[in-house]
Amino acid sequence: MLPRIISIVALYVITLLLMALQKPLFLMWYAERAADASASDLIGVVWHGLLLDSTTAGYIAVVPWLMMLISVWIKTSERVMERMLKIYFAVIAFIVALIVAVDMGLFRHWDFRLDSTIIPYLRTPKEAAASVTWGDLLPTLILFCGYGALLYVAWRPITKVYKAVKQSLAQRFTTTLAMILLGGFIFLAIRGGVDTAPANVSKVYFSDNMFLNQAATNPIFSFISSASRSELKDSDYRYYSDEECAEIFSAISEDKEMANTESVSWAMVLAMMTFLARP
């Protein structure tokens, strides 16, 4: 039981620290804009940003937690668990590092943290890349590789914590109960605490300086949150069938033609009256 709990707690704490590391990195990246901020403001960026960092760490810990919970009842060797965790950490490190690097590069041009606004540009990558220079690309590429490697190296020791120990039925129930309790804390972290409102970007805003509020925002949470809200289908806005739409537009067109005809007729009458009124 203990190795499972240790691995999840360690993953959460390490991820939280790595998410918090983005704040001073962002402030250094845009040092010219952070130069006027006081020391308390800079500390506030990290402190207030911990809320969304904690939520993001909770999201990342969910899958390993579920794997550990399932392994209580389905026999899983240490080698298999280690391999699954390595694959998961590699994929997540790639995705997180990519989001962080792209966000860091685009903020200079967009002046807000990465969100679903970027999705339409991904459909036309050639056009989007046409305006990118090596001055923009090289630093973000270095950041992507460096931060991604840091994430994976920090997470990798967790893959060796799990131990496939044979347990009695009572021990399995005890372990399951402990894992479910731990899952409750993860859920609270994802939700952003016990407040009425769940975690959202505005919860980390603490300053009249919008740059500092943006610096406190977690780009991974910002992107996932906005992307989930923007997943609306065309059918969500369709109140009429195609046939009904055609009839409505046809009626509008006919009314418009009649209005144009009447306008022309009245214009001719006014012109005639003006002509006759001339001495």
Where do the model's predicted regions map?
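Hydrophobic core of alpha-helical transmembrane segments in multi-pass integral membrane proteins
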Residues: A93-A97, F144-A154, L177-F187
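Membrane-interfacial interhelical loops
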Residues: L21-L52, L85-F144, Y162-V165, R191-F221
